[in-house]
UniProtKB/Swiss-Prot annotation:
Disulfide bonds: none
Single annotated GO MF: RNA binding
InterPro entries: PA/PA-X, PA/PA-X_sf
Keywords, comma-separated and alphabetical: Decay of host mRNAs by virus, Eukaryotic host gene expression shutoff by virus, Host cytoplasm, Host gene expression shutoff by virus, Host mRNA suppression by virus, Host nucleus, Host-virus interaction
Site feature Important for efficient shutoff activity and nuclear localization, where: 195, 198-199
Species the sequence originates in: Influenza A virus (strain A/USA:Texas/UR06-0195/2007 H1N1)
Compartment(s) where it occurs, according to its Swiss-Prot or TrEMBL record: Host cytoplasm; Host nucleus
Gene3D superfamilies in alphabetical order: Influenza RNA-dependent RNA polymerase subunit PA, endonuclease domain
Site (Important for efficient shutoff activity): 202-203, 206
Active-site annotation: 80, 108
Annotated protein name in UniProt: Protein PA-X
Length: 252
């Protein structure tokens, strides 16, 4: 599973996942399924933000990666992937600037258009079950919840899906692709079932083979994130900024 993750996800996402697991004292060599789950969740958060900006009129617009409008404001602030101290600093700054109510738990994103925090969920189970678990944990109507599954299902607060259908289709296609690639390597069952994962761990099974280089497209506009095992597209300037911000070691 570890080899699969390193082949299938953007190196920055892998690095962020490693950092997150280290922060919580988890060993990715042992908790390989959690490593894969964290990388998947991070990628969905980044894809959620991809292409979405706010223009000078305060309207939400979708900008293609080749579009020269680099000075537009990103619609979503990405909170997930930062160390806890920095993440809470970002949340506090958003609350002070926008007047938003401070959440009890760290959310994944902030939507500047709708002025709300968003909790993203990616589940291997039934979406409604995971949604209820998230809602019971958060216990706040101020935080918007959006759940995706590997089967293409989704569920969101008050059926408000925030993004346009095409943007959500990119995310669903990517998740379905990850599932198919795991299944082709005999990893999917262990990813879904902890019992099966323990069996594979005891047997010392490792994923084999190189990732395929085929391309799956979702509608007209397709993020390179959907290239099955190639790094997801991100604006180069934003990538540099995020890397400096997310991976910066906190001062002791």
């Amino acid at each position: 599973m570890e080899d699969f993750v390193r082949q299938c996800f953007n190196p920055m996402i892998v690095e962020l996942a490693e950092k997150a697991m280290k922060e919580y004292g988890e060993d990715l060599k042992i908790e390989t399924n959690k490593f894969a789950a964290i990388c998947t969740h991070l990628e969905v958060c980044f894809m959620y933000s991809d292409f979405h900006f706010i223009n000078e009129q305060g309207e939400s617009i979708i900008v293609e990666p080749e579009d020269p409008n680099a000075l537009l404001k990103h619609r979503f602030e990405i909170i997930e992937g930062r160390d806890r101290t920095m993440a809470w600093t970002v949340v506090n700054s958003i609350c002070n600037t926008t007047g938003a109510e401070k959440p009890k738990f760290l959310p994944d994103l902030y939507d500047y258009k709708e002025n709300r925090f968003i909790e993203i969920g990616v589940t291997r189970r039934e979406v409604h079950i995971y949604y209820l678990e998230k809602a019971n944990k958060i216990k706040s109507e101020k935080t918007h919840i959006h759940i995706f599954s590997f089967t293409g299902e989704e569920m969101a607060t008050k059926a408000d899906y925030t993004l346009d259908e095409e943007s959500r289709a990119r995310i669903k296609t990517r998740l379905f692709t990850i599932r198919q690639e795991m299944a082709s390597r005999g990893l999917w069952d262990s990813f879904v079932s902890p019992k099966e994962a323990k069996k594979q761990l005891k047997k010392g099974l490792k994923s084999q083979g190189q990732c395929a280089g085929s391309l799956i497209k979702a509608f007209r506009r397709t993020s390179p994130a959907l290239r099955i095992l190639e790094p997801m597209w991100m604006d180069s300037n934003r990538t540099a900024t995020l890397r400096a911000s997310f991976l910066k070691c906190p001062k002791k």
